[in-house]
From Swiss-Prot:
PANTHER family: PYRUVATE DEHYDROGENASE E1 COMPONENT SUBUNIT ALPHA, PYRUVATE DEHYDROGENASE E1 COMPONENT, ALPHA SUBUNIT BACTERIAL AND ORGANELLAR. Tetramer of 2 alpha and 2 beta subunits. GO terms for cellular component: chloroplast; chloroplast envelope; chloroplast stroma; plastid. This is Pyruvate dehydrogenase E1 component subunit alpha-3, chloroplastic.
Amino acid sequence: MATAFAPTKLTATVPLHGSHENRLLLPIRLAPPSSFLGSTRSLSLRRLNHSNATRRSPVVSVQEVVKEKQSTNNTSLLITKEEGLELYEDMILGRSFEDMCAQMYYRGKMFGFVHLYNGQEAVSTGFIKLLTKSDSVVSTYRDHVHALSKGVSARAVMSELFGKVTGCCRGQGGSMHMFSKEHNMLGGFAFIGEGIPVATGAAFSSKYRREVLKQDCDDVTVAFFGDGTCNNGQFFECLNMAALYKLPIIFVVENNLWAIGMSHLRATSDPEIWKKGPAFGMPGVHVDGMDVLKVREVAKEAVTRARRGEGPTLVECETYRFRGHSLADPDELRDAAEKAKYAARDPIAALKKYLIENKLAKEAELKSIEKKIDELVEEAVEFADASPQPGRSQLLENVFADPKGFGIGPDGRYRCEDPKFTEGTAQV
């Protein structure tokens, strides 16, 4: 049965689940351009030998991986019922949470910039639900849903958005800086590209623990960032280092085609970001980011490679945000027809259709999940609203390593609690 979730065509001379050590990978052939940048591009690579003679390597596609899995499982489906319901619940949580954030922002419960993730849920769910708790995720300013997918509670994320002490950063991080040590959510970053070096460092730490300290560590790191980041220096520097040291990291480009108000096609000399992977000696893959099952299959291969010590992968997920850049953006620059085209490809609606048509779930089961998530999000709002504001003295906590430094006076009290502090007459 033909569906929107037909296996994506992704080809490479070095399969995602294979080794490419000591090979120079260069792109040599692209599929013909199409009107939809998100149509699947085949990736063909060549290997150069010492005599500079060009020789074609075997091409392995994701379809072959999918067929092998289907023959092993004696089924034509890519997921089980349990997996499908888990994916659906996570995507519904992300969408419902962000919709509620919009309501709370316009009611004055949130302040500053708030960037929502509506439309991009297939990317977060497709990758993060394959990870373990000890794996790390590094995000951007559009980080609420990444945190939720990684296991941070809706209460903790909503409270952080409300600026309350019960938030995952005790109310000091806000929308763009979700962090949880418990869940290895290593932060959202307000400046584009700033999270990529952090993610590369986390991956280096995993490799060091395994190879130098001889610890039983197969942790991987997933770094999320947008198309607008891919012209920044940190991106290229970290691709180089990750390939050089064969770090267990997956670089995930959430290409939503717009960097604030700048079209991706106007901002870069070559809009096909995935090609930058082979330039540094790692697989580069382009996948339909509106399709959670396609994303998931690619993610499986990339994560497996990283766990086996075979190095990094660059994955370009072409997706689309259904709202403006932030809640302060009236979204007047994007063409209405373009927005309508992508809205018709809603990843949640597509997954719902797939689950029902393949008899993996009934309408009533999915409605039950939606109801449960609505109640969970509403309860998170009530919890956040009732939570206390952080005390002013908290501003100086966790800033200085010396507990008797600037933040705390000789009497053991925080200096900012001294009335003279606010008067500007305190001796510091």
